[in-house]
A protein has these predicted regions:
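Surface-exposed loop/turn positions within WD40 beta-propeller blades
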Residues: 22-25, 69-71, 79, 280-281, ...
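Flexible gly/pro/ser-rich segments immediately N-terminal to CXXCH heme-c attachment motifs
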Residues: 175, 308-312
Length: 583
């Protein structure tokens, strides 16, 4: 799933979805006001788990898609077709003497490029072909140069470049529509091509982007991480020129001069597993056990400084997400395979934030065959959602939810704020935030809610709506830690209590008082938070609640038995205690 912005108007957002049937079939679709199918120029590889490793990135109104196919190329939706980025290098041209009765002499060097034009504006250009060396026989007036077979990548014209020096400057001497396959060259050797030609661009300026695994955008350039095809590039960070740089099709090419890539320790620590950013001006790149920070330098010949931040922490693929901390400062969340949830704060410090759920984390199946994790940050609720596979599951079956506003920084890392969600919506192979009016065929709302694509059936769920989980009832509950008012050497009794909840019509809970780690439990059913006269908070007395000989007390709040009719919020529980004789 991906939310694509084809314009600067966010109400024009499109929802893109890829559905797969095992290893046999796939459907790539986009929704504007209706759903339509998109046919990629290169079919997705549906074996080896690659069908679950597709990622997208919006830039300049285009949707760049990183996926494995038979071609080692990045792909892009340009509004009309899903094609390969850039244009491949064509083959070398051929040439022959033509125009009898002349005296054209001197060895020439020819090469061709393919270009796409819109009117007179060049949109894309290929690298030059290999060079053809041709020596005219001296008895003809011209040389007829014939273009090679087309690359079939959307070129509208081809360019002929010529030089009198194999290793010298080349000049564009013709730009011709692809339907015309020949160009006649009658330039005298003594005149040369610099007089009437246009200096050609350098070799290495229009390298097509290979099949990267992960994509980011830094201001107006595309950043490509890893590779589906080449193990030597699995730890590579590469980037396109800035959009207003000289040249054309800048978001669809890689330059070799200046060098526009860096290899992050190559094989050490394995392949790149993803990246996030920029966050506070920094791009964060992860391997399974390494973390790197890249910072823009402003220097064209060395665009990024990259340093290793940690070689003992790393991230599971799909688990990295930008969010905010409890203070509202931008930060990065990720799942380290060993210790689970972690956070990189605004000061660049890596902190563990999953100690409170480490028992649950130990059930996560890092060897899941298809998908280990998916993640998103739900801004409206200040929540980080991770969908993970547990035990023997090969796809996510549990959702870990961190309520960031409830977290606290401690000497043990970031603590508190955790909830564990199961049910149908936890089984997500794909997630994104999208407009809450996705079902309406109107301009898209700017209120974005989590949408999940399930692991069974061609179903996309819009979450954070209603009081069930796609028709399945569930029980929401929260349990506090045990509290000891004095010490565990002293007992006390409970004679009465009260609970404070947000006023909501039809909202009710069952409240349990737990003595000494489960030694005894009293449950008060149907605590109702319906308002009586417009109050915003409801205080409900807890009558007939008597319990003695407690050393600790804990509380459990759960959906009232019989089903959920409204959402509830418990804000405070108070007990009146009766001291007893301590032991």
């Amino acid at each position: 799933l991906h939310r694509h912005l084809p314009t600067t108007d966010e109400s024009d957002a499109e929802l893109w979805a890829l559905a797969v049937t095992g290893t046999s079939a796939s459907d790539l679709c986009r929704k504007t006001t209706t759903w339509s199918t998109v046919a990629p120029v290169d079919a997705l590889t549906l074996t080896g788990g690659y069908q679950y490793q597709v990622s997208g990135q919006t830039l300049h109104g285009k949707l760049f898609l990183a996926y494995k196919s038979a071609e080692d190329r990045l792909h892009v939706w340009d509004g009309t077709s899903l094609r390969r980025c850039g244009i491949a290098q064509p083959a070398a041209p051929t040439a022959a003497d033509s125009g009898g009765g002349g005296t054209l002499s001197g060895t020439r060097y020819y090469r061709t490029r393919e270009v796409e034009l819109s009117g007179t504006v060049v949109l894309r250009r290929s690298e030059p072909s290999d060079t053809l060396t041709f020596a005219p026989d001296g008895s003809h007036a011209s040389i007829t140069v014939t273009k090679p077979a087309s690359t079939g990548e959307g070129a509208t014209h081809w360019e002929l470049e010529a030089s009198l020096d194999l290793n010298g400057d080349y000049y564009r001497i013709a730009r011709t529509i692809v339907g015309t396959t020949t160009v006649a060259d009658s330039v005298a050797y003594g005149t040369g091509y610099a007089v009437s030609g246009t200096l050609a661009e350098d070799v290495g300026d229009y390298e097509p982007i290979p099949s990267a695994k992960y994509l980011l955008v830094d201001e107006d350039r595309l950043i490509c991480l890893g590779s589906f095809e080449d193990a030597a590039l699995a730890a590579r960070m590469a980037w396109t020129p800035v959009y207003n740089d000289t040249g054309v099709g800048n978001d669809e090419r890689i330059t070799l001069d200046p060098v526009s890539y860096k290899d992050l320790d190559t094989y050490e620590g394995g392949e790149i597993t993803g990246g996030v950013g920029p966050v506070n001006g920094e791009i964060w790149i992860f391997k399974w056990s390494h973390i790197y920070k890249a910072v823009r330098t402003g220097v064209r010949t060395d665009a990024y400084d990259v340093i290793a931040i940690s070689k003992s922490r790393g991230a599971i693929p799909g688990s990295m997400v930008e969010g905010v901390d409890q203070f509202g400062s931008p930060c990065v969340y990720f799942l380290d395979p060993r210790v689970g949830p972690c956070r990189i704060g605004s000061n660049g410090t890596v902190m563990r934030c999953g100690k409170d759920i480490f028992t649950t984390w130990q059930t996560v199946n890092l060897d899941a065959a298809n998908v280990v994790a998916r993640s998103l940050f739900y801004r409206a609720a200040s929540q980080v959602h991770w969908f993970v596979a547990t035990d023997d599951a090969d796809a996510p079956d549990l959702r870990l939810v961190l309520h960031v506003e409830q977290t606290r920084d401690t000497q043990d890392g970031v603590r508190r704020g955790w909830a564990i969600w199961d049910g149908p919506s936890a089984s997500a192979l794909a997630v994104c935030r999208y407009a809450d009016n996705v079902d309406a065929n109107v301009a898209r709302s700017l209120y974005l809610v989590p949408c999940v694509g399930l692991s069974t059936g061609a179903t996309i769920l819009r979450t954070d709506t209603g009081t069930d989980d796609n028709g399945t009832s569930y029980v929401a509950e929260a349990e506090t830690k045990p509290h000891a008012p004095n010490t565990i050497m002293h007992t006390f009794g409970v004679v009465s209590g009260s609970v404070l909840g947000t006023a909501t019509a039809g909202a009710s809970v069952d409240l349990s008082i737990i003595r000494d780690f489960g030694l005894e439990t009293i449950t008060i059913a149907g605590v109702d938070f319906s308002p009586e006269s417009g109050e915003t908070q409801v205080m409900v007395p807890l009558d007939n609640m008597t319990m003695g000989e407690l050393r600790t007390v804990a509380f459990r709040v759960a959906d009232a038995e019989g089903g959920v009719s409204a959402r509830w919020a418990v804000n405070q529980i108070a007990l009146k205690q009766q001291p007893e004789q301590g032991a």
